[in-house]
Amino acid sequence: IARKNIMAIEYEVTPMNYSGRIEFMSKLQADVENHTRKTNPIVDYGPFGRKLDSDELRADGDILYYEGTTQNSHLSVACGSSHGIWKDGAEQKNLEWKSSVGELEAEVVTGIQAEKGETVVLEKMICYTTSLDLGKEERKSFVLAELERAQEDGMQKLEKWQKEYMAKFWEAADVEIKGNE
């Protein structure tokens, strides 16, 4: 996979009847738990509830970062996200990012002026890795470096690489469906 640890999301906002400040808020929610019968009626097994302990949660500039460890297997996950704002085809570099960190949630917020009909784009890069792939000392630096690389590559390159990868994948895939003809 071209960049198996990276996911990219692009949000476009175009004010139709408004000129003024547009705010973007991005959250990293660490308050996750296994589904129960209440939250998913097809689930009928345990263990229920929160089984991932938070080891680190932080927000710095446009970066969110989290590490957590499962209670029973002690597998760990590290993830983060980075953000860029684009207007008129140019990345907006001198934005002020405000951040807050709670016990199980962190967020970053920024804003930018936009005119009616002007499109503003938020590019959000997300990176995940686990203790199955990297040791504890390597995970944080890996996530932060991958996020930086993804921001440098940008959405268009990442999308191009993913399309090329998927085209090669499906070219080599040998899928036959029989029955119900």
List where the protein language model places each region:
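Acidic/polar, glycine-enriched structural segments that form the non-catalytic walls/loops
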Residues: I1-E181
